[in-house]
Amino acid sequence: MRNWILLYFIVPAVLFAVSGCGGNPSSSAGTPVTSASPAPSPTPSGSPTNATVLSNVEDSPKWLTCGACGNSGGTGSVANFSFTIGMPAPSEDGQSTQFAISPSVAFTNAYFYRQQTAIPQQINSLAYAFDLYIPVGMEKAPQAIEFECQQVLDGWVYNFSWQADYPLSEWRIFDYGLKRWDATPLNFTHFTPGTWHHVVAEYHNDTTAHTVIHDALTIDGVRFPVNITHNAFFSGGGNQFTNAVQLDSNSTATPYDISVDQMTITYK
């Protein structure tokens, strides 16, 4: 498959981000939240004034991967995985990117990331938006689908991660400092196959308090405020900014793929 990449090394800052992530149930933390999702709020329109906008991020051939780094603890068996850019179908604008995993061992995962230009200051608003498509017949295959942006600034890691957990049917966020996934009040309604779904994750950080704030998650035009804060983690690494997608395999190591289109990162 075109543009298949498998790396056994990775810059330290990104490795910090994915160590401990993954779909293995043992990586879960705390008691699942069973309360109903909070009431939705109106979805903001347009980009913030003076914002930087990175468009069609998925179309680049510069996606990187990193072997077993997406597994729990960042170790273990390496799944077969791939990405393919320029897919004419399914697509919304004539070309999408397909991310695929074909594991031979249960609970192995595939992490795909892109290095962007480092952001040398506090992020007052960050929106990671994309459209996602799951083929008919693969809708029960994922253990989880994850996506994130991450800033490393002056040695501090600000990790903005979401996980759609299929067995628990809940949205979770990653606590980078404690290396665990935490439940949120948001119920996860599994993505309907054979159609596009619009996802927007909103974040910001506080570089004085060294905290990460998950502001809201929007699914198919319905915005849910979250307002959950985690501590950043000091790694001592150089300034970086990355975005990522991860596919987690289930207990039967079922292969699957997703397509992503119109991926945009907006920040100021």
Label every model-predicted segment:
Residues Y8-A17:
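Bacterial N-terminal signal peptides
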Residues Q95-I173, Y267:
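Secretory/extracellular carbohydrate-interaction modules
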Residues F130, H198-I228:
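Carbohydrate-binding surfaces in secreted/extracellular proteins
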